Amino acid sequence: MQVFQTIHPCCCGLDVHKETVVACVRRTGADGTIDQELATFPTTTAGLLGLGDWLVERRVTIGAMESTGVYWKPVWNLLEGRLELMLVNSRDVKQVPGRGSTELAEVKTDVKDSQWIAQLLASGLLRPSFVPPLPQRELRDLTRTRASLLQDKSRTANRLQKVLEDANIKLAGVASDVLGVSGRDMLRALIRGDRSPAQTADLARGRLRLKIPKLTEALSGRVSEHHRFMLRLLLDQVEQYEQQVSKLDQRIEEVMSPLQKTALQMLDEIPGIDRRAAQNVLAEIGTDMSRFPTSSHLAAWAGLCPGNNQSAGKRRGGRLRQGNRWLKATLNQCAWAASRKKDSYFAAQHRRIASRRGVKRATMAVAHSQVCVCWELLKNGQAYQDLGPQYFEKLNEDRTKRQLVHRLEKLGYTVTLQKQDAA
């Protein structure tokens, strides 16, 4: 008995694993009869090319697979262009009702999984994930690798700081950046062990030289040979990470297309978003905003909007939706930077929400606004124009007057308002 309406008469469900791919070709006749053909292929290049030939011979026009780790990528790369492909979230496949009442629920096997994917695809019940073109996927690899290396560098710097604390070197309490130019000179002097604390402190540069007495006291620790070995090892690791990040920066600039570089300049104008962050954003969302009908769709895809929690006509606070964690992390950092930029709309928005809902919610709200601004700029190709720090006060002048009068009255003042004539 046919349960679902047929949208794709000839399609294929792919159950992808590390070493094998199980394919189920599903054909639905005009009279509703269903014919299924199953085959298993290795995930070697020859095996996947054979899978493509097998599907083309059977005139399959569309196939679907779950986003299983990184194992789906070789399958997608070799089948892309030969037929329409759909990558779906495993959660969406499991949450579709109906499998529990069919014979597919009796035993869970790779064959049953491929048949279920094919059945959902044939019925049009699968929601495709956004898979960008190959150049953008390669740019993503570069930006995500750079982000991972920067995280590794931060962790290594924290380990280095722990070694300094173990040696009772309080350099971080005096110098704002232990890994700055002055800080590294002092670290190398500590590693060599050929200078007194006063001589090491004398390596300070710029404004840090005003703190030489404090530096001398902070550098008077007990540095053993073990500490020197660990400091040398960790400082070398930090410098290696910096060299690798520099190579990635250069490579990212090389592979970006002229269109992406134009978009990069537009995003770089947004407060809180620097060039590196703009590269990360473009690598995740691309320049073609037709994939996202509205800015709200993009915000939801990025995981920067609350989930739905509504009952009896009342909306309650909900947890953030799952989304693109790389894009969310980048925009969270950008939102925090924007909140500290004076005389900007985002800073005013952050202050306004933080006073009522807290800093974390305010930062997330600014990140939501930033991703919506990114969509508007990329969609319309227009330059960024800041609304200004007075936007919310001008938006509701009466409320602003009431709030200010109330604050003065609480201090014991009697307030009389008189509007000035325009000059």
Where are these regions (language model features)?
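A detector of single, family-specific signature residues
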Residues: 1-423
